[in-house]
Amino acid sequence: MHIKQTRKCVACRESKHQNEMLRISRVNNAFQLDITHKMGGRGAYVCKDKKCIDLTIKKRLFNKSFKSNLEENIYMLLEEYEKNN
């Protein structure tokens, strides 16, 4: 039996296949942008859609997901990704 790998976006709350999303991973209290979806640790997802990325950056939605304040560089990485794609 094949299991669908769907995840919920922190911004729009829609469930989509994880390949359509960006993942932020927390491993040993260090946060990283996980493009390959292969890092271990706790993760949270955002759609690759511009609106979702903008809302996530504006409202710092990953802080709520991880119940912790993320370093500013994570949100800067999201901005970079958005500009380049």
Residue ranges and their predicted role:
Residues V27-R42:
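Short linker/helix segments within small regulatory modules
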Residues R13, K48-I53:
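Cys/His-coordinated zinc-binding microdomains
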Residues K4-T6, E14, N28-Q32:
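N-terminal, polar/charged subdomain of small-to-medium soluble alpha/beta proteins
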Residues T6-C9, A44:
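Residues immediately within or flanking Cys/His clusters that coordinate Zn2+
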Residues D54, K58-N85:
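C-terminal structural segments of small proteins and small subunits
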Residues H17, K38-R42, V46, K59-F62:
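Arg/Lys-rich, often Gly-containing low-complexity segments of ribosomal proteins
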Residues M1-H2, K8, L22:
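N-terminal cysteine/histidine-rich coordination modules
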Residues Q18-L22, I53:
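Short, non-ligating residues that shape and space the ligands of small metal-coordination modules
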